[in-house]
Amino acid sequence: MRTGRYIGIMSGTSLDGIDVVLAAIDEHTVAQQARYCHPIPMPIKQQILAMCQGQAVTLSRFGQLDTRLGILFAEAVLCLLQQTGVAPHEVTAIACHGQTVWHEPEGVAPCTLQIGDNNCIAAMTGITTVGDFRRRDMALGGQGAPLMPAFHHALLAHPQERRMVLNIGGIANLSLLLPGQPIRGYDTGPGNMLLDAWTWRHRKAPYDKDGRWARSGQVHQSLLQHLLADDYFLRAAPKSTGREYFNLGWLERKLSRLGPVPAQDVQATLVELTARTIAQQVLLCGGCEHLLVCGGGVRNPLVMNRLSALLPGIEVSPTDKFGVSGDDMEALAFAWLAFRTLSGLPGNLPSVTGAREETLLGAIYPVMPATEKT
């Protein structure tokens, strides 16, 4: 087993920053030791958003963005090392998920694309880097997502209790940790993505702090029904989605079927959409005793309150109460996946992704021992 210290990097679909964590990992434990959040410059964020929504881009601009993100990820790691006093040679590997700019798991040639050049990360830090975690699963017929349920099971499953883990990032995804049943998980639909995009358009703020703007509006029932009628919510698992599907263009097409709707009412309706689509899936799967929530959405009290109201009898709690940082869950998960890859262990779950078999995940970008920086 390649036990040791690992660094995980995650920027996520919300684009609210680059989360970097340092953790000591072995076969049985993941012990977080430090965290750091690195800002994403607005020009880079805007380029990513444009690409995710299908805007044309030259190969030159695409390549430059790939390099710039790789450099930015490396700088985030170097800041964490400086903050902690940990030397590069003390770190076994870096795990970098990369920034998803396209995810298309269906069709004749399924594909997923994460950018942020791992060569830049390995070269600038002198640390072996593991990246490109999703495409091997997809090559075996899987969705390439979600990859979190295996990690959720390793850290948060209980032998008797029915538990589900909900990650509310840009997209919301659910992991079913039900005793005696195969581990399952899938994307329920939009999490913070539409809420943040709508807030930026109308308030020029990165997110709706504490759901205050949404509280000033009312749920528009006709709009809500139009949104809930989308085919994605009716599809059976395994399924996964992203910004290339749930974006402002999607919302505007739904709005075009109605008369004018006040912006604050749209925001209130989007909160209800997120909560309702999550709650429906929890109940469809037979419910649970504990719904453990992580990701940025856990800090939106309006979303959390709606989940509690829609799921009576289920304890809705942050994963922090169970010993795992909700803010750092995804970065920790990819650090753990890198540990599994370097240890020769599979990282995917066919019961979750639909892949034909278990497999190692990720590509390894090694460094020469002589280049390790002290």
Curated annotation (Swiss-Prot):
Q: Which UniProt keywords apply?
A: ATP-binding, Carbohydrate metabolism, Kinase, Nucleotide-binding, Transferase
Binding of ATP occurs at 12-19
Tell whether Repressor is among the UniProt keywords: no
Pathway noted in the entry? Amino-sugar metabolism; 1,6-anhydro-N-acetylmuramate degradation; Cell wall biogenesis; peptidoglycan recycling
Which leading EC class covers this enzyme?
A: transferase
Q: Give its E.C. classification number.
A: 2.7.1.170
Q: Which cysteines are joined by disulfide bonds?
A: none
Catalytic reactions of this protein: 1,6-anhydro-N-acetyl-beta-muramate + ATP + H2O = N-acetyl-D-muramate 6-phosphate + ADP + H(+)
One Pfam family of this chain: AnmK
Q: Does the keyword Nucleotide-binding apply?
A: yes
- Quote the InterPro entries the UniProt record gives: Anhydro_N_Ac-Mur_kinase, ATPase_NBD
Instruction: Provide a GO biological process annotation.
Output: amino sugar metabolic process
Q: Could you state a single Gene Ontology molecular function term?
A: kinase activity
Known function:
Catalyzes the specific phosphorylation of 1,6-anhydro-N-acetylmuramic acid (anhMurNAc) with the simultaneous cleavage of the 1,6-anhydro ring, generating MurNAc-6-P. Is required for the utilization of anhMurNAc either imported from the medium or derived from its own cell wall murein, and thus plays a role in cell wall recycling.
Which family does the record assign?
Belongs to the anhydro-N-acetylmuramic acid kinase family.
Q: Which NCBIfam families match?
A: PRK09585.1-1, PRK09585.1-3, PRK09585.3-2
Official protein name in the record: Anhydro-N-acetylmuramic acid kinase
Origin species: Sodalis glossinidius (strain morsitans)
Highest classification ranks of the organism: Bacteria, Pseudomonadati, Pseudomonadota, Gammaproteobacteria, Enterobacterales
